């Protein structure tokens, strides 16, 4: 069962849709992100898993309340909820784009119908239903990707070796520059970003924590974290290889790709126009599986947070089992509906991925720093955490928004020069260091 629970951690609609497009357009620099995941999963298994299982709470943020007060728990869980809503919206939107290309359905209708289906089965079975459904969908997803890659490779006139020849000649397997620049996506920038965002995912993301807590033992929970981390490398490599193979395929047969079909749209176009009907259906199922499993997990875990951190603490402090179930159902529906509206809002952005990164940087950039401040520094106080969070939020907002609003005039001098992926890195470090320095410099007078 733990292996099945890890399937969702290794595949998602973002990896399925974005990775092939990224490899097609550029190279394997983004694959460095995958290489960082085993590092984060190691720390999760060694430190975070036993820690959370010892707390005995379904919320990942009860520790923050114990260390710094109720505000810290509310802050962290609010950041989590905002991040999940943004994540759901971006995935629903990304999911609708290829389905629109594949079947010609209206994007808004795809978003609405998919969301209703996800809300329904999330409500019917709770977390266990999501875990088992994700396992089935995950196998379909991986199987569909492998089949698609094989078809691509063997469609080449000179066989699979031709894909590698073209890719090597055009440097499509490059992992990026090994220079020290912090303004572009070098190997090191991608690796550092991956370590921090995955430490946050494995360390305090409620999606992962729920899986630690549903394991029968510490050993199983640790295995789940490690297995999922290491599984992601070969799985993501398949998706990057699909993008590289697409590049080689359409370079060999340029007449098969219409003008205007670029980036993320190339893979869906290949599915529709180059695969047999049966395989096309399998890939359609895989794409839907990716989005539905990811969004369902976000809805279920978000509803749990609302129940434990808000409803049972501030609205109804002693809810009956029936009231708790009703609160979960209502939360599922509300979160799902909000996700629909966020997805519709993405219709107006130039790049869904850019918008998702900006939102995730703002909403999740400081949670890891706050957690580490309380986890590592036993003497850190409430005031230290508050000062740290304030400083961290300022840095995160500056790095995320200044490049957008400080484009022209003298204000351009104050725009962040750093790559956007480093936002969570600086935000986390600033919160931790500011809180730690506050603890050392602003000692309580006795």
PLM regions: where:
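Membrane-embedded helix-loop-helix hairpins and adjacent transmembrane boundary segments
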Residues: 1-4, 8-446
């Amino acid at each position: 069962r733990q292996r099945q629970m890890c399937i969702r951690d290794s595949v998602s609609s973002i990896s399925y849709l974005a990775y092939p497009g990224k490899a097609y357009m550029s190279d394997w620099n983004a694959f460095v992100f995958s290489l960082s995941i085993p590092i984060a999963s190691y720390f999760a298994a060694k430190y975070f898993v036993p820690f959370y299982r010892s707390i005995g709470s379904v919320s990942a943020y009860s520790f923050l309340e114990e260390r710094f007060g109720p505000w810290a728990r509310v802050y962290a869980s609010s950041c989590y909820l905002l991040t999940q809503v943004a994540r759901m919206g971006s995935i629903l939107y990304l999911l609708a784009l290829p389905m629109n290309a594949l079947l010609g359905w209206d994007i808004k209708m795809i978003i609405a119908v998919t969301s209703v289906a996800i809300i329904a089965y999330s409500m019917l079975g709770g977390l266990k239903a999501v875990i088992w459904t994700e396992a089935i969908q995950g196998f379909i997803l991986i199987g569909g990707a492998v089949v698609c890659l094989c078809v691509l490779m063997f469609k080449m006139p000179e066989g699979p070796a031709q894909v590698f020849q073209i890719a090597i000649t055009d440097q499509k397997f490059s992992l990026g520059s090994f220079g020290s620049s912090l303004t572009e996506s070098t190997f090191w920038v991608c690796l550092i970003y991956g370590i921090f965002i995955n430490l946050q995912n494995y360390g305090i993301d409620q999606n992962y924590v729920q899986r630690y807590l549903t394991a029968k033992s510490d050993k199983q929970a640790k295995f789940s974290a490690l297995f999922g981390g290491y599984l992601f490398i070969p799985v993501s490599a398949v998706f990057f290889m699909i993008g590289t193979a697409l590049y080689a395929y359409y370079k060999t047969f340029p007449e098969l790709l219409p003008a205007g079909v670029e980036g993320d749209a190339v893979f869906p176009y290949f599915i529709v126009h180059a695969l047999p009907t049966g395989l096309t259906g399998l890939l359609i199922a895989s794409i839907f599986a990716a989005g539905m499993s990811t969004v369902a997990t976000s809805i279920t875990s978000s509803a749990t947070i609302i129940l434990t951190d808000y409803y049972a603490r501030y609205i109804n402090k002693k809810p009956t089992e029936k009231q708790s179930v009703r609160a979960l159902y209502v939360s599922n529906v509300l979160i799902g509906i909000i996700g629909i509206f966020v997805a519709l809002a993405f219709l107006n952005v130039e790049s869904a991925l850019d918008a998702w990164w900006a939102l995730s940087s703002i909403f999740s950039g400081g949670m890891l720093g706050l957690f580490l401040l309380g986890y590592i520094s036993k003497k850190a106080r409430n005031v230290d955490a508050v000062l740290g969070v304030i400083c961290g939020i300022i840095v995160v907002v500056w790095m995320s928004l200044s490049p957008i609003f400080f484009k022209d005039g003298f204000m351009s001098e104050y725009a962040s020069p750093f790559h956007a992926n480093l936002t969570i890195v600086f935000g986390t470090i600033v919160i931790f260091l500011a809180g730690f320095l506050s603890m050392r410099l602003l000692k309580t007078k006795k």
